Amino acid sequence: MSSVDNEFLMEMMDFNDEVEMCEDLASLQIIREANESGLSNLFEEFERYFSEGYTDIAANRLTKCKFLLQTRERIDQREDFLTVL
């Protein structure tokens, strides 16, 4: 598996902190849209690099996609929590 740069990991930590601190559904929706946009962009990059034969870069993008998919799950969990309140 390819490594992910420290800057990206720090961004993911900050992003996940935002999810956990979010106190309303409207703000959570903004976070969700940013996450989905990032996921879409990374997947497009993955497809492009993979089709061009840059498998190391493609693997890196796929690894980053996995982080954003995990964040999607956290967003869903936070939404469930906020809906119950």
Where are these regions (language model features)?
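C-terminal accessory/regulatory regions appended to core domains
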Residues: 1-85
